[in-house]
Amino acid sequence: MGHNAPPRGCAITLMNINEIDRVLAAEPRNVRALILKADHLANAGDARSASSYYLAALKAAGPPQQVARELQPELQRARSMYERYASQYQDYILGQLTAHGFDPATSSPRFAQSLDIVLGKKRIYLQQPRYYYFPGLPQVQFYEREQFPWLAALERETDAIAAELQAVMQQPAAFAPYVQGDRKRPPNEQAGMLNNPAWSAFYLWKNGEVVAENAARCPRTMQALQDVPLARVPNRSPSILFSLLQPGAHIPPHNGLVNTRLICHLPLLVPGQCTFRVGNELRDWHKGQAWLFDDTIEHEAWNRSGETRVILLFDVWRPELSQEERALVVSLFEAIDAHGGGRKPDWEI
């Protein structure tokens, strides 16, 4: 028996299984009883059931700082036992899948993600738009580039776009904090990003309107986007911007407004150690390698380097929406704006 095995005599002899079950019937989240039940099942050779009770005890215990001191050693043992069983289970499942041809490097990425979820290595993230939800759309974190025939042509313009960016960056005041306060709206601290220049933007288009002075400074960038299916909604989109993240900055987890669009990133100035998360998937930016993602799925970003990171960021229609559906979405938002007396909507990319 390994050093992580449950004690065979001490606790279990003090409370038999019937007594443990009676306690759990009355108090299903009794941590001590859950651990004792797990120990009993482990001694009986039922590793799978024991694992579920150890996990239940860990969940019932709550945050470590709230656990009574005398219970902490037992919880540490429960965690060790659960992790050992989970590792054994994972090794078995992977062994069986490998025997049937599964290879993490070449097999279906969607299946690989489902495997990580079923093994408890990743959690499920779904669309949670903060403003408008269009039902029936697939839950995809990062989209496959093959769905966007215009993407390769845009990437070929990376150097020209980056040159225009460098000219803009000669005037740091051209960038403004991405998250800005509005006196007509309740304050929202945005986890420290409100009016924070660590995350800044230089807009070519903003909320469906061209920023003429800025666009005139970046003609190659504007030309490169001519064939892109931008999500055109009056007073709302597209927004096209250079998004700047200062050294050491972290954009906290957040969700976008509407799930009828996707966000595209074209990395332009990437020093390394710059990471982006959408749902349960992490990716590093690399210059000239664009991607599209659903921003209504929780996402966040880090610049862990000592240099500035800048990307070209814009929104496009989701490819699953028909032309009729796109037109109806536009009409809906126009009606909402008209009801508001023509006031500019509270909107962001």
Language-model features and meaning:
Residues 30, 39, 43-241, 245-255, ...:
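Fe(II)/2-oxoglutarate oxygenase catalytic core
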Residues 251-254, 275-276, 293, 299-305:
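Short beta-strand His + acidic residue motifs that chelate non-heme Fe in jelly-roll/DSBH
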Residues 262-267, 292, 307-322:
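A short hydrophobic beta-strand segment most commonly corresponding to one strand
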Residues 268-287:
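A short beta-strand-loop-beta hairpin characteristic of the jelly-roll/cupin
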Residues 284-298:
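Conserved metal-binding segment of the jelly-roll/cupin
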